[in-house]
Regions:
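Carboxylate-rich, polar loop motifs that coordinate divalent cations or form catalytic acidic clusters
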Residues: 1-160
């Protein structure tokens, strides 16, 4: 319910969404418009000005006219591997990164295909020149040349209960 209220307040405070690639204007989007699910977890605007919306029922792409939904398709390695999209970010160079309940995925704007980068519990994703993920008290950075996540930071702080 909290996310619905936040989404409502967001739409009240923003009359239009302006992007670098194109001007997209809307007052609200619903499942009647094609949104896969009403509860929105995350939004991201890519370098082409497309709005990406993450929900509990998949990823949605809004181009100003139409919504296209991407969902898990069994036995299709190029589809989204988990329907619950928690966070979205991108590299402004053709890649959109997704934090899902089951790991991290990459969507290639050129090929329109998904690639699973990491399966398992991930707490956060962030992009700043490189893709970073947070797992418990560790931060990993994605190495595109190897396809691996390398340890970037390990918390050595341990606070114990007073005795």
């Amino acid at each position: 319910m909290r996310k619905v209220i936040l989404l409502f307040l967001l739409f009240l405070s923003v009359d239009t969404v302006r992007t670098q690639g194109q001007n997209i204007t809307f007052s609200h989007l619903t499942t009647d418009d094609g949104l896969s699910q009403f509860s929105v977890n995350s939004m991201y605007i890519d370098e082409q000005g497309i709005i990406w919306i993450g929900t509990r029922e998949g990823l949605n792409r809004y181009n100003g006219n139409d919504i296209k939904s991407f969902k898990l398709k069994k036995n299709d390695p190029n589809s989204l591997f988990s329907n619950t999209v928690l966070r979205i970010t991108g590299n402004r160079n053709g890649k959109v990164y997704l934090l899902c309940t089951d790991g991290v995925a990459e969507f290639d704007l050129a090929t329109q295909r998904f690639k699973t980068l990491l399966q398992g519990n991930v707490d956060a994703i962030y992009f700043n020149e490189k893709l970073y993920i947070g797992k418990r008290e560790e931060v990993f950075v994605y190495n595109e040349s190897t396809g691996n996540f390398d340890l970037f930071y390990l918390s050595l702080i341990h606070i114990s209960e007073p005795t």
